[in-house]
């Protein structure tokens, strides 16, 4: 039986051994899957973490947990927010952004998806193009022939079909990714859509600590650095209370 994992901050070999032995009393066997050098846990289902290197694990435990053998020093994301390829590559892995990273798959459970190519039409006019229940799209910059990405939303009182924006597509224009690739429109992809997701990820991590330290490679937490800009002021304030 595989159970959910437990995560223990600053786990020493003694703490790990205690957990292993305690589990055995109740018939469970724990495995030390990984040690993270740093981790930001947003909720029970979403986190971003960096595996500790194999060398550091060996020095700390005398062995290397399985995931750290294969991915030591690499980042891992659980949950959609940090798994988005553009977000993960931009903020964490620093891998090259590929065309596929600029594509979004959209689905609807009822009705169908439509592209409304109305950008060059008079206000109030529409050109609905049927897509289906699933499609892959790229956000397109204004003025480049993009369309509104819509879904069927029932009927009006007069029996006319109503449309609403597909989830996550509002405020942007779109084209099917296959068309973007074939027409070589990669330069027309609206990066603002993806940069917004990057900004939201940074904002989320910043709720729990210093983002620049979290993604940095120096391994020094900002609150322990000796050259904090306010250190001198704090020392001076402390001296004001010295017994003279």
Regions found by a protein language model. Give the residues of each.
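Catalytic palm active-site di-aspartate
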Residues: 1-9
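C-terminal, non-catalytic extensions of nucleic-acid polymerases
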Residues: 13-244
């Amino acid at each position: 039986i595989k159970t959910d994992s437990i995560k223990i901050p600053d786990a020493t070999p003694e703490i790990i051994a205690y957990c292993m032995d305690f589990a055995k009393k109740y018939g469970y066997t724990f495995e030390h899957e990984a040690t993270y050098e740093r981790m930001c846990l947003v909720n029970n289902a979403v986190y971003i973490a960096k595996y500790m290197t194999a060398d550091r694990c060996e020095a700390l435990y005398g062995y290397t947990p399985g995931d750290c053998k294969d991915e030591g020093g690499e980042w891992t994301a659980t949950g959609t927010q940090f798994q988005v390829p553009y977000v993960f590559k931009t903020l964490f892995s620093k891998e090259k952004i590929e065309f596929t990273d600029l594509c979004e798959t959209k689905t609807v459970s009822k009705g169908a998806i439509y592209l409304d190519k109305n950008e060059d039409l008079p206000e109030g006019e529409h050109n609905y193009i049927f897509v289906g229940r699933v499609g892959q799209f790229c956000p397109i910059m204004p003025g480049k022939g993009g369309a509104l990405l819509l879904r069927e939303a029932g009927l009006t009182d007069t029996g006319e079909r109503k449309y609403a924006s597909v989830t996550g597509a509002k405020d942007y224009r779109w084209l099917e990714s296959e068309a973007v690739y074939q027409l070589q429109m990669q330069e027309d992809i609206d990066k603002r859509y993806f940069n917004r997701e990057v900004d939201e990820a940074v904002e989320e991590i910043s709720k729990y600590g210093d983002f620049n330290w979290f993604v940095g490679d120096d391994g020094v937490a900002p609150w322990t650095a000796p050259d904090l800009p306010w250190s001198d002021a704090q020392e001076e304030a402390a001296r004001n209370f010295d017994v003279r």
